[in-house]
């Protein structure tokens, strides 16, 4: 509901009180809502209830937008655009993961497979579901995580940075195996996985199965990371041709020129 242009404004005293009470959403709709209430002869309790419902709904929308922005999602994709039939992840597995019970249990999710097989899309759509349930998500690429470690090493605040990351109930680390892994990135991955162990959920996408992480980072560090990551993890392996490449070859990757 939005304020109608012809609806009389609120009395100044009432508007000021609503500002002091931090009720911006109810204040915005109040003129129109009060006009409707007068015309339809609402009971006073109905007016109060309607204003409170608008405020609660507006706060919910604002908090959701804040969580989405804080998550750092790469594209904004959701399951509204997801085709479960195209994915090589079994449909029952997709459905089970979408319940988010694994996040509630602080379990991990690893999706590994070739590029273009929907790993990032699926993780982002899951992350969107998580924020819609009122929980927080933190999204990183491994390169970004390495940069964070390097930036905080100078003043010895890496541990504090990891603690801040783990304020989120779900931490997503995307696209492992696409680029060479720096020592900072390897350390960042270990630190986050270690700190999250049995306390938060990690969702990870990779071109490699975690068993092959010792090809990307020092064996000792890889072993310790994978041990903690996989102990309580669901592992899904994707396969098949790149969806992006298939769409491009079929002429579906662009809007036709006219």
Task: Pin down the residues of each PLM region.
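Intrinsically disordered, low-complexity and often Lys/Arg-enriched segments
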Residues: 1-16, 251-258
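Conserved hydrophobic/aromatic pocket- or pore-lining residues that grip, position, or stack substrates
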Residues: 82, 123, 141
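A conserved segment at the C-terminal end of the G1
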Residues: 124-128
């Amino acid at each position: 509901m939005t304020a109608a242009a012809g609806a009389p404004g609120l009395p100044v005293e009432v508007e000021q009180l609503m500002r002091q009470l931090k009720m911006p959403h109810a204040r915005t709709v109040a003129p129109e809502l009060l006009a409707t209430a007068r015309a339809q002869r609402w009971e006073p309790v109905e007016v109060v209830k309607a204003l409170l419902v608008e405020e609660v709904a507006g706060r919910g929308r604002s908090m959701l937008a804040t969580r989405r922005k804080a998550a750092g999602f790469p594209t904004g994709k959701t399951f509204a655009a997801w085709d479960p039939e195209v994915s090589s992840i079994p449909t029952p597995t997709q459905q089970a993961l979408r319940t988010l019970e694994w996040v509630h249990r602080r379990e991990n999710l690893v999706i590994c497979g070739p590029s273009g097989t929907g790993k990032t899309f699926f993780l982002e759509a899951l992350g969107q579901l998580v924020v819609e349930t009122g929980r927080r998500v933190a999204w990183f690429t491994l390169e970004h995580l390495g940069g964070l470690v390097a930036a905080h090493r100078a003043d010895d605040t890496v541990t504090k940075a990891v603690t801040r990351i783990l304020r989120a109930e779900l931490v997503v680390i995307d696209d492992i195996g696409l680029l060479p892994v720096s020592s900072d990135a390897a350390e960042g991955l270990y630190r986050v996985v270690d700190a999250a162990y049995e306390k938060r959920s990690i969702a990870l996408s990779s071109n490699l199965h975690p068993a092959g992480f010792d090809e990307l980072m020092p064996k000792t560090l890889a072993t310790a990371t994978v041990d903690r990551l996989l102990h309580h993890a669901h592992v899904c392996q994707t396969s098949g041709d790149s969806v992006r490449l298939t769409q491009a070859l079929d002429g579906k990757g662009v809007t036709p020129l006219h």
